Amino acid sequence: MAKEATRIRRRERKNIASGIAHVNSSFNNTTITITDAQGNTIAWSSAGTMGFKGSRKSTPYAAQVAAEDVSKKAQEHGMRTLEVEVAGPGSGRESALRALQAAGFTVTSIRDVTTIPHNGCRPRKRRRV
């Protein structure tokens, strides 16, 4: 019984001109996901997947490197224009946005979609250093 050769599944090239970049910047990491208008993921990257570990993940430079990586992947699918949705309190928000603009995307709109509680859950304790 010979084992069947496993097929290598290639990503099909979608030809999408415009999309939405979701930049989620927490205190620990920055993730950037590029979707089409329906919300289907086309490309994603994060500071952690780019090889940054620990406290280096939360730096603006790590967010910039992740944004450059995800923009390269999205441009392979023919993407040219982006709407940017920024969420979270982290330090990688602006640098990720600048890196997306520098990669050659036309940014049509920038929205801050950070969730703000109307006095919901109790927040974590204050940090004393």
Curated annotation (Swiss-Prot):
Pfam families per UniProt: Ribosomal_S11
Q: Tell me a GO biological process for this protein.
A: translation
Q: What NCBIfam families does its record include?
A: PRK05309.1, uS11_bact
Q: Does the keyword Cell inner membrane apply?
A: no
HAMAP family to which the protein is assigned, alphabetical: Ribosomal_uS11
- Can you name this protein? Small ribosomal subunit protein uS11
Which keywords appear in this protein's UniProt record, sorted alphabetically? Ribonucleoprotein, Ribosomal protein, RNA-binding, rRNA-binding
GO CC terms of this entry? ribonucleoprotein complex; ribosome
